[in-house]
Amino acid sequence: YAADAAYLVDRCDSNEYLENLSNIFRKEAIDFYIPGTDVELIFCAVNKQLIKDKFSVHTIISSIEVITFSNNKYKTASFLRENGLNYPRTDYLKDIDIEGIEYPVIVKPSVGCRSIGVYKINNLEELTPHLENTKDIVIQECVGNEDEEYTCTVVKIGDELSPVLALKRVL
């Protein structure tokens, strides 16, 4: 990645995080802030008005409700299905017929980030340990390959939508 500057900041659950942002906002004369990681989204949505009032910086971020909804893989897949959009087949692990699974599949928490608890499963033997605790675990059709990841962003300000930015990241 290319950037004019880079900063190491404390975790967003740290008391120092907002102070870290404040220093960057002042030093770099920031007008708009777009949080870059899943873990800071809720913090930034909650503190959006504070950041604007205290630092005159506009945080470009969805509402807490949208973030909470979209963090849930099952709800997101259901929304995509209901709106005629493509999505990987997604079910709660507790609700599926184990014998009918077409491998490989992805097993992961319904709500999570940073690939924590995400497993590519190639057969029943690999799936078996995950069957012990199926609470809030989803199973998804495996798309792409393990060397790449897809992400998509749309920004809405008022009634205006930006073009869709779809990225394929090579891991």
Residue ranges of predicted features:
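Short acidic-hydrophobic, aromatic-tinged amphipathic segments that line or gate anion-handling sites
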Residues: A6-C12, R89-K94, Y119-N122
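Short loop/helix-cap segments at secondary-structure boundaries that form the rim of catalytic
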Residues: Y1-A3, D97-I101, P129-N133
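Phosphate-binding site of ATP-dependent enzymes
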Residues: N122-L171
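Glycine-/Pro-rich loop/turn segments that contact NAD(P) or position catalytic residues
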Residues: I64-L93
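ATP-grasp fold ATP-binding core
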Residues: L80, T90, I101-I116, K135-E146, ...
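ATP-binding N-terminal substructure of ATP-dependent carboxylate-amine bond-forming enzymes
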Residues: Y1-I60
